[in-house]
Amino acid sequence: MIKKVLIANRGEIAVRIIRACKELGIETVAVFSEADKEALHVQIADEAYCIGPKLSKDSYLNTTNIISTAKKTGSDAIHPGYGFLAENADFAELCRECNIIFIGPSPEAINKMGTKDVARETMRKAGVPIVPGSKGIIKDTDEGVALANEMGYPVIIKATAGGGGKGIRVARTEEDLIKGINITQQEAATAFGNPGVYIEKFIEDFRHVEIQVMADNHGNAIHLGERDCTVQRRLQKLVEETPSPALDGEIRAEMGQAAVTAALAVNYSGAGTVEFIYDYVNRKYYFMEMNTRIQVEHPVTEMVTGVDLIKEQIKVASGNKLSLSQEDVTFNGWSIECRINAENPEKNFMPSAGKIQMYLPPGGYGVRVDSAAYPGYSIPPYYDSMIAKLIVHASTREEAIEKMKRALGEFVIEGISTTIPFHIKLLQHEQFVSGEFNTKFLEIYDVMNS
């Protein structure tokens, strides 16, 4: 079993991992940038070391300093969390070369799923449904135009190395397409160091449904149900729930099996998420991508299954078999998560860095808060704006919505602006309450002024 883990991350996910390690009797090492010396993960870990200046590229992405800190502290494993180095195959390979366990899949699996055009082709061969589109990277704009004419507009241009809503453009005309391909290639070369793009048919009316999978190094893989992440703003998720109000039992079982097939096709191990576009009008689903890491929204799955996904990741990385089979997985009730960001929803979600003067999280039965915030904590402006995740669990969707409204009303954060007022309005919106909406929900409805 792993004895000591270095957590190569910050914020709430670093705190979450440290807590899981402590319960497993594993020692923890926190790393931090100069801007994060007062951060909560630094205070609760057994040891903590500064790995560089405030900017991510000099600290949380500084592989040399992270590996040398792991070696210096005698850490036998590194947990990358999400973001930063979590889906970096080179870093996973570096860990392997240095005899450090990377708590995640193999570099080969990350490569296969991280390069989006390769992932598409792998899924096609495995029989997992994919959106109609190019077979691999397009050579030039001529090929793109020919494909788009064949499929029909609109089409979506995607950077093969992109992710997190970046490197994506929709084209509705040939002119849009030519311009879009050129711009996306340039942006992708700068942002990801890989100019490759591919195109897909753009399905306009869909829901974003993802399946949580878990696999070990002994050939076992299971799914732990779906999460509906349809409420998004600028391709960034804001609210997640499980089960999805749009799925029936038959589609749920099919998608779950497709996700397991996807994981087995790349010899996957650890926690992963297979994202699907769900065309609910025609009851068809298509593979979108696989995230080869733990997701921000993993707690909703934990609430309905009772499985601690972080602990399971650590056990699997230690060489253990999965602690449960597909038959052992049961789903109980409904869970919703709201991402509380340091942003001002009244001012077009403008980031709001600063000092938290008062912090009073909600409590009560079925309420969970995953956060690294505390009174007096200054939010650095250099990283992601999420400061807390508020998760509720209840018997039904209606009860979960009421519980979330109560919890949001109790949540006090003063000194900065947060998205709490937005979430309160969203949960009162009749379209959200009905459960019938698509990814354009926030484009169609002005939630703040409704």
Residues of each region from the PLM?
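N-terminal nucleotide-binding beta1-loop-alpha1 segment
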Residues: 159
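Acidic/histidine-enriched active-site and ligand-binding environments that engage anionic O-linkages
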Residues: 147-156
